[in-house]
Amino acid sequence: MNVHRVMIGTAGHIDHGKSSLVRALTGVDPDQLKEEKERGLTIDMGRSVLELPGGGKAGIIDVPGHEKFIKNMVAGSTSVAVALLVIAADDGVMPQTREHLEILSLLGVRKCVVALTKVDLVDPELRELARQEAASFLEGTPYAGSPVIPVSSVTGEGIEEIRRALAGIVGETPPPRAEGLFRLPVQRVFRKEGFGSVLGGVPVAGRAKKGDLLEVLPG
């Protein structure tokens, strides 16, 4: 099986449907924290595996869209190679849409697929205007010309097209280097009873195996 270590990261304004899209693509609810479910928004990063056409796989990280959790968004994007930018057709380009795109560009993420979500809520005319706005928004950025795909997590429209577009980009994206020193940016820390502090992240270089001694920096 062709298993990629390439990571896809969601981006976009709060309530534009990032978590719902990830759920439709993977079958996994990325919002696992009790507070996330109670408040209906993503606070920490959710992780899942995306099955791609042709038998491949890629990791997918759902990052927060709310401005209060922008530091979590940055942490989640450090290992991302492909962006899945979510723009709601009934709302258009919003402040966090712009902010997230700038952050992704600064972090060196060079590939992007735009999901024009919630198209089931708008009429054909508004849908086309939203598509044109999204394409125009990308002009003058590293993501100009990226595909803009209408999608609905409710009806299922566009889900397979999104999956195919991501598969094409992932297939062209080299995975992180397997040689050299093992490096893993710490993206989350949590405590587990009986284990203590547990660090989470995605390797960007090298390999590690059970029993290896790792150094945490800065010390």
Residue ranges of predicted features:
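Conserved G1/Walker A P-loop phosphate-binding module
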Residues: 1-63
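Conserved structured catalytic cores and adjacent interaction surfaces
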Residues: 3-8, 104, 119, 155
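Residue-level signature of catalytic and energy-coupling elements of molecular machines
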Residues: 15, 21, 40, 62, ...
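Alpha-helical scaffold elements adjacent to nucleotide-binding pockets in ATP/GTP-utilizing enzyme cores
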Residues: 21-24, 96-103, 129-137, 161-169
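Signal for well-folded cores of large energy- and translation-related assemblies
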Residues: 26, 30, 34, 38, ...
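Conserved Switch II/interswitch segment of TRAFAC-class P-loop GTPases
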Residues: 57, 63-68, 77-129
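Conserved catalytic-core segments of large NTP-driven translation/proteostasis enzymes
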Residues: 136-219
